Amino acid sequence: MMKRNNLIDTLRGFAIVNMVIYHLLFDLVYMENFKIEWFEKTPGMIWERFICISFILISGYCFNLSRNHKKHTITLFIVAMILSVVTYFFANEFFIVFGIIHLLCLASFITIFVDKLTLNKKILCVLSFVMFILTYKISAHPMDISTNLFSFVGFYNDKFYSGDYFPLLPWYFMYLVGYCAGDFLDIKLNVRENVLSKMGKKSLMIYLIHQPIIMIIVQIVKFLGGI
């Protein structure tokens, strides 16, 4: 269970809406050859980074609100495995080896131990942000190594591919920024429950089912001659 904060859930819901729209456009552009020039250029990349960073920061922050970290981590692990198995057998060209849910699962697991340490969270927050910047491009290109066993860290060769890829470097540092912020940034401002906050509370379920639904809708519209 997690202590709910409608403002946090609203922000998460906003990120979810952005993610669904982004993936809809992604499917249209890269699977149906729909031409959206801005989406394929810098604005699309910035939008994608904004969505990912939002999710990771909020997840790190919410670590402090969770009452059962082990249960949450196990839930993320199950969802991550479902995503890997489903994409391997039914969408192999988009097989997810280590995507954002895998990252959040491992980040939650590691942070269970980090949370037991006596650390100055403000200093750790600054150091984590600096390390995020310094390691940002580590996983941007393949390395001259013989194995992909450490692809979850960010080290892989040119034979590696993952349809969604968020390794520990640099992304765990962004998770730590959110985690540390949750210790000294006590968000007391709250809002009334709304559509976005309701979506935020169901974000994991929406993440799990939104892509198949989008693909089905796109194919139906395509069949009817709308694309």
What are these model-predicted stretches?
Residues 1-227:
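Alpha-helical transmembrane segments and their immediate juxtamembrane cytosolic regions
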